[in-house]
Regions:
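Low-complexity, small/polar and acidic-rich linker and loop segments
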Residues: 403, 410-413
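A conserved FAD-binding loop/helix module that cradles the flavin
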Residues: 294-326
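A Rossmann-like FAD-binding core segment of flavoenzymes
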Residues: 78-103, 112, 178-264, 274
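FAD-site-proximal beta/loop scaffold in flavoenzymes
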Residues: 140-148, 252-301
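Local cysteine-cluster metal-coordination motifs and their immediate loop/turn environment
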Residues: 358-372, 385-403
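Beta1-alpha1 glycine-rich phosphate/pyrophosphate-binding loop at the start
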Residues: 20-77, 156, 161-162, 166-202, ...
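FAD-binding core/adjacent interface of flavoenzyme oxidoreductases
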Residues: 3-8, 17-20, 71-158, 236-245, ...
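Active-site-proximal substrate-binding core of FAD-dependent oxidoreductases
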Residues: 285, 318-354
Length: 413
């Protein structure tokens, strides 16, 4: 890939409908890899993302962001591809017609028609409710990373990070560079699970090196948040650590309990969902003809898996099956890593018991746990409490309820 050069931003025109051979939704690692794989075919390609620059969450730009070399190379290659148009800070508003979406940015709205579409819509954090989680000073673990990259001042602030998965260590590293004082990294997985995961990392040397670099003396297994304490803002965190309750004074708490695939657009387009992710075949093709998906909207495995899945989808979308097939062994390698990741960091059922009767589950509509516990499902809960009907449209509470109550989220309409 060539050296970094500035990328283009193709804005919308409210007076026209644009036509493309291939439309890619999402400009994270999977979306960029898909565009670059498809570009040599000469197809007219559009890639849209609601962020101001390509890279997704893992390669998010910002005043304090240090983009890795791979991110810079992919950005440069994307900018150099003359048949690829990037629509940054752009969102999908509606499905206007078959093979046609209505898009908008801050200035206008317009339609885009496509022959083939690749969904690279990524994932969002799973946030579970617990007493005090709405206090100022409490954020998601990934949310904290985004704030740090955006320049939020953390110098001297005491920070506790809790939840599950490698993102906790990555968030801690970012916060430490910004001047935060790490007090505890509370991982809910057991020591046995972490040991088994670590023993497998030799199969993926780059991941073993990364884990070694992120290792932190404040990391504890068998630990999870019980409550955030404070009156008007966060003052301390109560943790369960190996069965013992401890309290740690702090100014910030960042929690992340894994990821939830962003499947809403895929579902609205008629793509089948399985195991809470968009279902795909060996070619990354969805159940709907001429629709593909790649990256964490199809399951979680890190940027390496997202990149290879995106490339397979890009090649397959333009008929380059031979090149797509050549990447199958590489995908299998990273899928094996994803399997280990998801197995070893499976959530402890105790986390379902964190919320108390008056703990808010839906923050937008002020719906407490007690108003939901006796409901039979998601639709019943919405009818009786307006849960999930606020500004975030259930992106936070919907995933939490799915985990807490085993509800099935209905297909978006």
């Amino acid at each position: 890939l060539p050296n970094p050069v500035p990328y283009r931003h193709a804005g919308g025109d409210s007076a026209m409908t644009r036509d493309f051979d291939l439309l890619i939704i999402g400009a994270g690692p999977a979306g960029m890899a898909a565009a670059l794989a498809a570009a040599p075919s000469g197809a007219r390609i559009a890639i849209i993302d609601d962020n101001p620059a390509p890279g997704g969450q893992i390669w998010r730009d910002g005043v304090q962001a240090q983009l890795p070399a791979a991110a810079q190379r992919y950005r440069a290659a994307l900018a150099a591809a003359s048949n690829v148009q990037l629509f940054a800070a752009t969102r999908v508003v509606a499905i206007a017609a078959p093979q046609q979406l209505l898009l908008e940015d801050d200035n206008s709205a317009w339609n885009v028609r496509y022959s083939t579409l690749i969904l690279c819509t990524g994932a969002r954090e799973l946030l579970l409710p617990f007493p005090g989680w709405t206090l100022p000073g409490v954020t998601g673990a990934g949310g904290l990373q985004a704030l740090v990259k955006g320049g939020i001042p953390l110098a001297g602030e005491r920070l506790v990070i809790a939840g599950s998965g490698p993102l906790l260590l990555a968030s801690a590293a970012s916060a430490r560079k910004a001047g935060a004082q790490i007090q505890r990294i509370a991982e809910q997985a057991s020591l046995a699970a972490l040991s088994a995961f670590t023993l497998q990392l030799a199969r993926w040397p780059s991941k073993l090196l990364q884990a070694t670099q992120l290792l932190d003396s404040h990391y504890r297994s068998d630990s999870f948040v019980v409550a955030a304490l404070g009156s008007e803002k966060l003052e301390a965190v109560r943790l369960s650590q190996s069965g013992k309750i401890i309290e740690i004074p702090c100014e910030r708490l960042a929690c992340g309990f894994g990821l939830i695939a962003n499947t809403q657009l895929g579902q609205a387009l008629g793509c089948r969902v399985a195991d809470q992710a968009i279902a795909v075949d060996d070619w990354q093709a969805c159940s709907r003809t001429d629709h593909y998906a790649a990256g964490e909207c199809t399951g979680f495995g890190g940027s390496e898996l997202a990149l290879v899945e995106g490339a397979i989808a890009g090649y397959a979308a333009v008929g380059e099956q031979h090149q797509a097939r050549a990447l199958w062994p590489q995908r299998a390698r990273w899928q094996a890593f994803a399997t280990q990741l998801n197995r070893r960091f499976a959530l402890n059922p105790q986390l379902k018991q964190l919320a108390e009767a008056d703990t808010l589950v839906c923050r937008c509509e002020d719906v407490p746990y007690s108003a939901l516990a006796e409901r039979s499902g998601w639709v019943d809960a919405k009818l009786h409490s307006r849960c999930g009907m606020g500004p975030c449209q259930g992106r936070i509470c919907g995933a939490a309820c799915e985990y807490l109550f085993d509800w099935q989220t209905p297909t978006p309409r």
